[in-house]
Amino acid sequence: MSKSYECIVVGGGLAGLTSMAYLRKNRISSLLVEKREKLGGLVETFWHQGFAFDAGIRAFENSGIIFPMLKDLGIEFPFVKNEVTIGIGKKSMALEGKNSLIRYEEMLADLFPMERESIGRIMAEIRKVMGYMEVLYGIDNPLFIEKMDPVYLRKTLLPWFMKYQVNIRKASKLQEPIGVYLRRFTENQALIDVIIQHFFEDTPAFFALSYFSLYLDYSYPLGGTGKLPEKMAEYILENKGEIKTGTGVVKVNPENRTVTLDDGEVITYEKLIWAADQRSFYSMIEGGFDEKVQAQKNLVERSCGGDTILTVFLGVEKDETYFQERCGSHRFHTPSLEGLSTVHFPVHVEEAKEKELFRYTEEYLEKTTYEMSCPSLRDRSLAPLGCTGLVVSTLFSYDVVKRMEDLGVYEEFKAFSVKTILRVLEESIFPGFQEKVRFSLCATPLTMEKETHNYQGAITGWAFTNPTMPSEDRFKKIANSVKTPLLDIYQCGQWTFSPSGLPVSILTGKLAADQVKKKKEQR
């Protein structure tokens, strides 16, 4: 006889772990199934030759969600403030508070003196959105406050809720792609590039402009970002939840309420929470589909995954002082004022020749914006004495890398990318550091796809460029995002709501678990 659970959670990223934690908190018998041996998904820390590297997200923005969730579950571990710096060419500035926006404006004006007035108007837009953010994330998300103090409810939550309604309406109007939106204020494409090219393609204006608030909200867990899934898993196991890693789901039968694992085991569920790739989910459903299910399946299959990244992990024989003086612990670095709009992408990439692709890659890596992170500058134990681990990443096309693989030059592409990135960094910010690089590792969009099992290696769910979004994208409707057209099957994670990120993954994980709890109480 097959095993049976009140709820099965498929996917061991933070969304699935959150769902599982709250299911067990509410004493709902549950099993989490994860295809990889390791939990965490895009939140992971790995070690290589004594250096710790964060493989996915580099730091956490609380957004009124992460810390309240941990407090609600009684999970404690130390964090430090994560300071972000922004560098363009030879100039840089640290984001230390709201007044840092003044220095950011001055830096842009020094670089683009003819655009001083336009820059001032753009900064006014950023301040406006920061005002919205202060309201939207100004208090702990009430979803994670189980026992509400009546005084808190009356004096804090209700006034906040009234402001929230007003500000969410204002924010929801800023859905235009950020590049299009900024052209209202300037026609200088180079200026637009340095402001937005580290955002995902066609990121909505509100989401992009809000990042200046989110940067101030970043924290870093001592021990690396992987401490979060590690502590979540400990909580689940301590509360008698079951976790099965290294095992994937290959079939879902909604009619029989069963999942079939890749080892042939069939398990019965009352409720199912899918916290993994949605294309995989709709490809493995067995049985007949009604019109709503077929329509969603068709939409998912014709939609594109969001942007993915190219990452280089470096072990460098330079101490923390060298990197603290030049980049800090977390930096967004644009080496060139010639932005990505000047880089010509092969229109028909599936037909592009090797030489053309390498030329494109070199030019792209010279003009892109890099996110750089030094884990050991927040926690000295994360690198050998006198050394520093450096993570350097940039958005990069999945299609280009796939074409490189098809042409049989994938390994050459990785080596070329590392060589080019090292040269660009040496010339722009780290003089003399190449000879001190002990080792380098390169993770491409194909690596992301293989390791995370996310379609096209996407790191934030669906692309903003999709004509019709397969997920909910209205903040007011986020509670409905976890529902699917299939009876007693819910969803959570980065494919569930757009725009996504770690806080949204955690939030939807909690919402999905709440739906299961609600249905159980109604029986």
Model-predicted regions and their roles:
Residues 3-138:
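N-terminal glycine-rich phosphate/pyrophosphate-binding loop and immediately adjacent elements
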Residues 127-239, 246, 454-463, 468-469:
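Active-site/ligand-binding neighborhood in enzyme catalytic cores
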Residues 188-201, 367-373, 431-498:
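A glycine-rich dinucleotide-binding beta-alpha-beta segment and adjacent secondary-structure elements
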Residues 221, 250-384:
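Mid-domain catalytic core of redox enzymes
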Residues 517-523:
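Active-site-proximal substrate-binding core of FAD-dependent oxidoreductases
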